[in-house]
């Protein structure tokens, strides 16, 4: 679930 977090950054 790191892709979503990386999208926000």
From Swiss-Prot:
Q: Does the keyword S-adenosyl-L-methionine apply?
A: no
What is the superkingdom listed in this entry's lineage?
Eukaryota
Q: Which UniProt keywords apply?
A: Calcium, Cell wall, Heme, Hydrogen peroxide, Iron, Metal-binding, Oxidoreductase, Peroxidase, Secreted
User: EC class of this enzyme?
Assistant: oxidoreductase
* GO CC terms: extracellular region
Keyword Hydrolase assigned to the entry: answer is: no
Localization recorded for this chain is: Secreted; Secreted, Cell wall
- What catalytic reaction does the record list? 2 a phenolic donor + H2O2 = 2 a phenolic radical donor + 2 H2O
Function in brief: Removal of H(2)O(2), oxidation of toxic reductants, biosynthesis and degradation of lignin, suberization, auxin catabolism, response to environmental stresses such as wounding, pathogen attack and oxidative stress. These functions might be dependent on each isozyme/isoform in each plant tissue.
**In which family does this protein belong, per the annotation?**
Belongs to the peroxidase family. Classical plant (class III) peroxidase subfamily.
Name of this protein: Peroxidase 9
What species is this protein from? Cycas revoluta
């Amino acid at each position: 679930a790191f892709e979503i977090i990386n999208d926000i950054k």
